[in-house]
Curated annotation (Swiss-Prot):
Inhibits voltage-gated potassium channels (Kv1/KCNA). Residues 58-59 are annotated as: Crucial for binding to potassium channels. InterPro entries: ShKT_dom (IPR003582). It comes from the Eukaryota. Its main location: secreted. It is found in: Secreted; Nematocyst. The keyword Disulfide bond applies. GO terms for cellular component: extracellular region; nematocyst. One of its GO terms (molecular function) is toxin activity. Belongs to the sea anemone type 1 potassium channel toxin family. Type 1b subfamily. It comes from Anemonia viridis (Snakelocks anemone). This is U-actitoxin-Avd11a. Residues 36-70 form the ShKT domain.
Length: 70
């Protein structure tokens, strides 16, 4: 009996090194991808900030500008 254990298959969209090179070649895309914006409404993000929930990863990503994550 032979058992083979392998890690998950690498997919072409998992090529992180290629992604980094792509970002370096086109700096205008880097600025667009990492823009400092709130992705939820301003009232939603204000309430997150007032409840001091910026430490929770989900809220920090939704309200990057309000929580000061960028």
């Amino acid at each position: 009996l032979v058992v083979s254990v392998t890690s998950r298959r690498v997919r072409f969209w998992d090529d992180f090194e290629r992604d980094e090179n792509f970002e370096e070649e086109r700096p205008y895309l880097r600025n667009v991808k990492r823009a400092c914006n709130d992705y939820k409404s301003s009232s939603y993000c204000r309430s997150v900030g007032s409840r001091n929930e910026c430490g929770i990863h989900k809220y920090r990503m939704y309200c990057r500008k309000t929580c000061g994550s960028c």
